Amino acid sequence: MLDLYGVWRHVLLRAGIGTGKDFLAEAETYRCAGRYDRAAQALALHLTLRPGDSAAWLQLGLVQQAANASVDAEASLRKSIQIAPAVTASRIALARLLHDSGRPFCALAQYRQALLSDSNFVLDAEDVERAGPRFLDKLQNGAKYDGRIYCDISDLLAYLRENVRATGIQRVELCVIADWFRSFRHDDMIFVFCRDGQSQIYRIDDELLAALIDATSRANASVEAYRLLLTVIERESTPISLEKGDVFFILGAFWIGIDYVQTLIDLKSRGIFVGVYIYDLIPVTHSQFVPTTALQLVLGRFADILMGADFICTISDFVAREVREVLDRQFGKSIPVSSVLLAHDPPASGDGKIEPEFIDQLPPEFVLCVCTLEARKNHTLLLDVWTQLYARHGERTPVLVLVGKWGWGIEAFRQKIEEMNFLSGKIVVLGNLSDAKVDYLYRHCLFTVFPSFVEGWGLPVGESLACGKPCIASNASSLPEVGGSLVRYIDPHDCAAAAKIIEKPLMDRADLAAWTAQIVREFRPRTWNDVTDVLLDTVKSSAVAGRNSERSLDVLFAPARVYQFGSAPVQVGAGVAATLSGWEQRQNRFALRSGWHGAEDWGCWSSRPVANVEFKTELPAGTEISVLAMVRPSPPSKTGTVVLRDVAGECATTAKISAAKPAWIALKTQVGAEGKIELQIQRVDTSYRQAEPRRALFVGLSAVVYTAIEQLPALRNQIEATSLEAIG
């Protein structure tokens, strides 16, 4: 804020007095004298006359920072960048300010942009120290892919709207993104998100993403702070168009929120490679550990991704083997499946600040278990083991500290420990802890336990070892890959045997000390930098290899069979040995080639006036056929005029259809070359209004059926004998 002196000067300027004065020289004089407030006033006067002077905005930001007016300084530096984005000096000044104000990832985003805008720019020692020792490692030898990798994190954005602390998949995403910022990599990796019901992809600004990573790293992180940033990200992110040779890679939980089918179809039809990081196949192989209310949706999304992906990365060799088996048995499909193993890094300590009250409440000795409290994690075994230990050793039994939020299928366990008064205080449950607190618990426990029935990897096992602490883990699924010979293993189904293994280091402290020393001496952790490097290299190599492979989108439809496009039910509970009947129908949606939103229960809405459908038949080319499509106009119109057209043969039929219920529209045409049938469905009336503000809706398609001309009467009888509800 200007004082009376500054106000008086502005008044004179507006009156035309002093416009020829050299305010820059005056500002420099004040700056050299250490009078930063007056220097800022002089620069502000100069900018009143020349608001487009980027260098002056930079100088104003610097003197404001010297005057401890950080908020004003940041605004001035951003104004300088807005005017001249290619000038690195302003970005470097802003990076320093952001770093010194506790926003290290925002600072890294600015350093990154400075290097991208000027390939000859060299960071000085001060900035290298701020950016960190690994930031420039890949500047010279970073391998560029001749396309771009678009990394989808839609699930992470949705997750952070409801959760303060990321665990599991979302923690992996945050660690990969954070490492991507910490090491300068060329501009071939772009983070994006999708909106449900739309096939459009949106680019996330690097600095907005960095601000989100900064927010998640703070000890006082809050959902409210996340939501403010997420709202800005969703508002400011711009739609982008991917090009042939690019890669669309889904980094997170693809079954949360987003129906990717139309996005995958659109991308693959334009020569874009689709990859996905699969963390486990638990919904497929161990469906008892998935909430029944979500199981059908989750299994359907797994089917869509497995059918649509060109290549797959997995977080363990165990998951890779499962994925290959499911692809072969369920789909008769073979695509590249590569293991990109996760890290052993401990949780980031954030600012390292821990309230003394937290430390004071901890027991002097404790065993630690870090994971969501849910049925799959097998906390019931731990309760039974600690009950046995307490019965034998009484108060000598160390406390079991469970760290994690309450999840699904754990109600009986929760009720039991509450009724037992948490085993007379020998079990403690802590939730919503900062990374610094979790790190403290790891480093001060006796050892950790992780008895899970099934995992895709097992982050807590690696975190324990990385903190120099022994771990007793389940011998199931991927867990032996994480800890190797340094971990002691238990059968998650054998409580009696597990109790003996857990009791040994508790009662034999010499054994525990020797085990701990062995881990400190021998363990070599895999870092998130290693993971990110391998992941990017694998994605690039998979895309390069895919250029020479067959990537057909063709869907085979048989005559006289109704193919529906709604969210089809899938077979539940049969695991890998399930028949194709459940997932087979979901392949129908891959016939919806362009111009479609995601599937709903009844079918799909077209996203533009003309939408395409394409499938193959085993009938010879030139065979005369009738194609019937069940369609409906979009609300709120009462009627709509719809055209069904054969793209290859230029045959068309037009019908006026009531919006009250779907109706069949028929087209006589011929099978095209290579057995293809290519259709267009078009809404041609122009008087309709849109019912939804965020989606354009035109025609709804529920089903398609075709038959040879001579079989049309029989097909009509079949349709008439079947209610619309049954086939729609």
Predicted regions mapped to residue ranges:
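Carbohydrate transferase catalytic cores enriched for Leloir-type hexosyltransferases
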Residues: 22-28, 32, 62, 66, ...
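A short beta-strand element within beta-rich, extracytoplasmic domains
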Residues: 613, 619-638
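Helix-start (N-cap) detector for alpha-helical repeat units in TPR-like alpha-solenoids
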Residues: 20, 54-55, 88-89, 122
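Short beta-strands within extracellular/lumenal beta-sheet-rich domains
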Residues: 598-620
